[in-house]
Amino acid sequence: MPSHADPSPHPAELVSMLESMMLIRAHEERLASLASPTAPGTCTAVGQEAAAVGVVRALEPRDRILTNHRSAGHLIARGADCGRLIAEVMGRVDGYCKGRSGTLHISVAELGVVLTSTIVGGELSLAPGVALAQKMGQGEAGAITAVFFGDGAACEGIFHEAINLAVTWRLPLLFVCENNQWQAYVARRETMPADPAATAALGGGRIAAWAAGHGLPTAVIDGNDVDAVHAAARAAAASIRADGGPRFLELVTYRQRGHFEPDDQAYVDPAELARWKPLDPIARAAQRLLDEKVIASGELSHLRERARATVAAALKFAENSPWPDASELANDVYA
């Protein structure tokens, strides 16, 4: 992939990305702690915050996003309000979709988030259409589409269909595979061949190799390194804007919690989980900023407390939001 990345982010931007990751973590851990049925079926992406923040922060307001059932990180990185997100999960009227979507079907038009899809690979079926509309003149000139999906979706036929269309029609589409090593309750190693030797040590690369087979420029990135993700995403977005063609990023990360909440992860090898824990993206980013003296330990504690306070206020907002009126049950239902 040619390098069109802007210079390294300003220290203030690095701190901002760390704070965004902390807010995402605090938000999802609070949701996970809520007793069912208060937040039923919540799917978290704890451990994958660098992938969300690194890519979304590389996009522009004119761009469009399609994502999946682990969507909170992408939404919060894009600027979504935690209170409205929690209200949506709780089925309250102040949620972004008036309490109808939960975390699995949410759409936030004002942020350019077209949809989240609970259907594995569902976002891949629609992303080429959004990018085609942009190419045909809909929306602002130079805008691109980013679609987030997991390694499970890469095992669906729509993965190849979407890439084939994007390459053939030269669509302004950024494919972002968050390879978190798990497909619901099944380990990735049980569903696809071994990774290429060049990227095996990183823990990924097979999915990017599939994409490259279609003639798509690809990159395999340490998805727990927010700086590396951000740089790769900026380069990919700049390349798309420059030549109009698609790009592909495989972000190698790890799902630290279960498939959904509650899930005791009894199927996960404790030794494997222990190997990934030291690679936690928030801890790594924080330590780097401390080592480089960009931030002091006291400031780091302040960021954590501010994230927790924001989520506490968000939960209170959601709890105080009214329930929808029964008379509106069929509103906004078109099929």
Give, region by region, the residue ranges found by the protein language model.
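Structured core elements
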Residues: 43, 66, 174-176, 220, ...
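Hydrophobic alpha-helical scaffolding
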Residues: 7-8, 17, 41-45, 76, ...
